[in-house]
Amino acid sequence: MTTLHIHPQNPTFCIALLALGLLTAIKSNSIPPEAGIWTLRLPKNYRQILPYCTPELQNIIECFDELDALSQLDTAAYTQTINRLIGDLQHILAEQAEQYELHLTISASDR
């Protein structure tokens, strides 16, 4: 398995940026709504990022659990929720925008 390591100056900004990218891809139907469950909301991932999430960011990521069901039950509410979450993430990013530097490393395990 290849591992991407992110070493951000501001973890909150980086997590919000990743969440915004996921929601934008979900909204455009590039990836399915269930992707939220299997990415940031996956329990092992969520436990790792939780200490770096503001309460507002935590609430947004917790909503990732509901997107798939909401997309099937109420498309209008689904669209409103996606738009609201994207707006909330844009607000978080604007507040955190002065500390956006990060360093990436990628390591591949031996097969």
Give residue ranges: language-model regions.
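Acidic, Ser/Pro/Thr-rich low-complexity regulatory regions
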Residues: 1-111
